[in-house]
């Protein structure tokens, strides 16, 4: 029995890992040269509590349950997850009514610990909030993580359990027999399939169309962000939401897992043809500055590290579309996975395998006896106690050679990232946080290129930033 998962974002990665728990041949096809680089890469990194989703929605079905799975999942896969809680703040009695509605809705969704706090308690917990705040809905189960690392960790563990990972190939068609997909055709080859799971993010509607399956039309909703320096660590301790609107949860202020402060996102609907254009604008970033200053007046915008934008898949029904196709019997759609997609993904992965494939499609799956649930992260040596780090340097001097000074990433970490599959600068960046600091690679990029060249045994001119067409250097000036 062969299963093919299309798309290596957080949904595709976790579903692929879930499938490797069974006696299946599992293939994950990702068009980029690394996993977690599409919708997954650029979002708010919030593991939502689950109060924001209407109880009758598919989103509500998976949000609170997905949230509850993150503790164990982060321990198994060894990625950062911090359950820091969140505030939805209100500045007047009209906004208080919205907090009361969210509280009731969250209780219906099974979200534990929700409570509305008054001004003094809010400011005692978050003293840097705007002193004009009157109330806050406190959700203690909300958390933060690194979305791309969830995908990377899941895929690394799945590969340990037999996953075939195919990178740099786009799905271009399907071969069907008697209304079932038999082969998936890509830009470079073909793959036999008894089960196909479509997790292609913003392009999932196009993949479903190619297969002749049902779909909902998707368009990109752009969110622009500002990342501030770790010098502001502790400015806020929780995820700070404004009172939400009909369009979005609002523009947030939140800490990142490694100590920075993230601001955003905006919410701008774009035409379908802009699915692959996550650009920032002067107007969008100004909106982020304006709205977040209302939440935390002391924000220091002289400490900007990076601005960026992300695109999430929005659909007319504003809800997930997770179904077995009626027209293509072995084809599962996991699409329209807008917020809270990151939160819901672990629960959706179990649902797809246990409910849709085994129950609805009536495909019996046999669990492996030798499934390995754990994966270990790359050791970040500067986080070790000094004596332990010294011993590591004695064993391997590369553990003491700093390459990225902003985030204190060593040569050994970069070599380990390459050993685990990094073939591009972004492949190294998202596994190690090198080039994520204040200089954004201005100092360390050239050194990382040399390490990639040495370890891969290729000329530097062949190394890409991210995609097939993103060359970094054209050749040597001196030979």
Where are these regions (language model features)?
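C-terminal catalytic lobe of FAD-dependent flavoproteins
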Residues: 153, 248, 257-258, 273-402, ...
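Glycine-rich phosphate/pyrophosphate-binding beta-alpha loops
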Residues: 52, 142-144, 248, 331-344, ...
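Helical element adjacent to the flavin cofactor pocket in flavoenzyme catalytic cores
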Residues: 137-195
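Short beta-strand to alpha-helix junction loop
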Residues: 54, 61-64, 89-98, 137-156, ...
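Dinucleotide-binding Rossmann-like beta1-alpha1 core, especially the glycine-rich loop
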Residues: 45-125, 250-251
């Amino acid at each position: 029995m062969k299963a093919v998962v299309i798309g290596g974002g957080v949904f595709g990665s976790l579903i692929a890992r879930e499938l490797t728990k069974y006696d299946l041949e599992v293939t994950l096809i990702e068009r980029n040269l690394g996993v977690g680089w599409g919708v997954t890469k650029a979002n708010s990194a919030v593991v939502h509590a689950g109060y924001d989703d209407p109880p009758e929605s598919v989103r509500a079905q998976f949000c609170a349950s997905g949230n509850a799975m993150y503790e164990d999942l982060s321990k198994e896969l060894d990625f950062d997850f911090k359950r820091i809680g969140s505030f939805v703040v209100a500045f007047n009695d009209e906004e208080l009514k919205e907090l009361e509605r969210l509280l009731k809705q969250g209780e219906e969704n099974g979200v534990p610990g929700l409570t509305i706090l008054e001004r003094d308690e809010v400011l005692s917990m978050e003293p840097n909030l705007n002193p004009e705040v009157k109330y806050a809905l406190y959700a203690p189960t909300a958390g933060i993580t690194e979305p791309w690392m969830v995908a990377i960790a899941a895929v690394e563990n799945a590969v340990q359990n037999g996953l075939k990972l195919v990178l740099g190939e786009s799905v271009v068609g399907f071969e069907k027999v008697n209304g079932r997909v038999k082969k998936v055709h890509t830009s470079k080859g073909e793959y036999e399939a008894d089960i196909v799971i479509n997790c292609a993010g913003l392009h999932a509607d196009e993949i479903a169309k190619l297969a002749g399956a049902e779909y909902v039309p998707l368009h990109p909703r752009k969110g622009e962000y500002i990342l501030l320096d770790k010098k502001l660590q502790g400015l806020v301790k929780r995820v700070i939401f404004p009172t939400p609107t009909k369009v979005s949860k609002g523009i947030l202020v939140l800490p990142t897992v490694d100590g920075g402060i993230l601001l955003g996102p905006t919410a701008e609907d774009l035409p379908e043809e802009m699915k692959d254009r996550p650009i920032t604008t002067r107007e969008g970033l100004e909106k982020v500055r304006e709205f977040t200053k209302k939440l935390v007046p002391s924000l220091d915008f002289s400490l900007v590290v990076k601005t960026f934008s992300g695109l999430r898949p929005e659909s007319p029904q504003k809800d997930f579309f997770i179904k077995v196709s009626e027209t293509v019997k072995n084809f599962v759609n996991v699409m329209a996975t807008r917020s809270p997609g990151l939160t819901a993904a672990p629960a959706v992965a179990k649902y797809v395998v246990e409910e849709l494939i085994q129950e609805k499609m009536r495909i019996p799956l046999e669990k492996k006896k030798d499934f390995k649930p754990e994966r270990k992260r790359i050791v970040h040596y500067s986080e070790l106690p000094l004596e332990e780090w010294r011993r590591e340097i004695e064993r391997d001097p590369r553990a003491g050679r700093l390459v990225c000074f902003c985030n204190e990433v060593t040569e050994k970490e970069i070599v380990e990232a390459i050993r685990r599959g990094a073939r591009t600068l972004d492949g190294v960046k998202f596994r190690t946080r090198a080039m994520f600091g204040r200089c954004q690679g201005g100092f360390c990029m050239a050194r990382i290129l040399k390490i990639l060249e040495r370890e891969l045994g290729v000329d530097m001119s062949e190394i890409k930033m991210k995609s097939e067409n993103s060359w970094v250097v054209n050749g040597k000036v001196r030979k």
